[in-house]
Amino acid sequence: MSFSAASLRAALEFHVPTGASGLVVALSGGADSSALLAAAAALGGSFRDLPLRAVHVDHGLQPAHAEFREACKSLCEHLGVALSVIRISINALAGESLEAAARDARYAVLEAQLKPRECLLTAHHRRDQAETLLLQALRGAGVKGLSAMPVCRAFGAGWHVRPVLDVPQSELTQFGAPLATPCVMDPMNDDLRFDRTYLRRLVWPVIQQRWPGVDAGLARAARHMAEAQELLDATGEADLARLRDGEALSVPGLRALTHARRLNAVRHWLNLAGAEAPSAARIGEALRQVLDADADQLPSIVWGELALRRYRHRLFLSVADPPRLADERLLPAAAGAQLDLGPNLGALRLVAQSGGLAADSLPPSLLVRRRAGGETLKPARSARTQSVQHLCQALGVLPWMRDALPLVFAGDALVAVADLWVDARWCAAAGAPGLAVEWRDAPIIV
């Protein structure tokens, strides 16, 4: 069956999640997205009664970008579809291609435009999918990369659906041919600086001459890879269920896995945390370093803003630059007093209760600061004074989080460490008024 409004409806029924609140077509002004919008408009709102609108992102890179913008406006007026035009400028980072920067900026705008539960529709077709797989293969991608583009994924406040991913480009072109408003040809499609354009103009014709069905074959291979990735994700989730130890992973458990399953489990763990996983080689080398280290070492591997850290027999994922308590600050020694400790550090609050710090013995204000080294404290129900360092080691406070611990002083005397320990010499007597230290919204420290 060739592409039509009816075939689009069938694809939308299958791929648009239940509960979607509307359809948003990403309209470039090219033939493919114009055909998709025309087919969606032909449904006349009959698909689940969902409203339809379009968004055009003008990044100004094409010499004819104004023509694209006007073509989009003309088409939407012709079809009776509401259009939003967003203008942006592109600034590629060092080492980043203009092609990648433009794509990322465009998707960032589209993501921001989505209202809750709206579905973004893009006109990626079978040829696009085949090209994506081939480009990923040339870059040495793994199974996930070779899955190319998913048909549906969570995106912003809603979803991103590619309803024509298995449709030949020729069918989209044929469907869009009768449109009253002609689409604009993108001159950037002839710019060989871009990898996809180079592949499309110089490499693809040679491959297609030898293998005429190459787009269908590669798109089918991408589907097989997507199914394989589902199995890898399921295996990773099953392994993580056995490996999880609080917020960390068990080092002995990781060691017991085969190399391939270990890599897969950690990659899945990183994905679930929203972290961009490095290459398999980098993950493998990082795991080798942290797993082979002696138990008394504190190996860590930093990737951008994140770090893998091992403490004793657990592996943690943390920020590369852990939060650190700022300079010393004052906290009124009164019930209800609260001190914000800074970003990602929560707040200290004093609560009236029997027990805790002896309210009558405290000065008007308490001093809160991070440890400087050498601090000691005699914990309640302990027979001797101990160093804060020793107490942290005994409790298993993560070494990289110890500078986040708020130490509470009455003058020069350390009276409490967060809500972990209170000095016995400053504890309220039975029945006497006391102030308990609460660390609210505290970061993970053990």
Q: Residues of each region from the PLM?
A:
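AMP-forming adenylation/ATP pyrophosphatase catalytic core
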Residues: 3-32, 49-53, 59, 88-92, ...
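Core alpha/beta nucleotide-donor-binding catalytic domains of modification enzymes
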Residues: 1-210
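Internal, active-site/partner-interface "lid" segment
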Residues: 189-196, 217-226
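Short, structured loop/turn "capping" segments at alpha-beta junctions
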Residues: 182-184, 213-218, 232
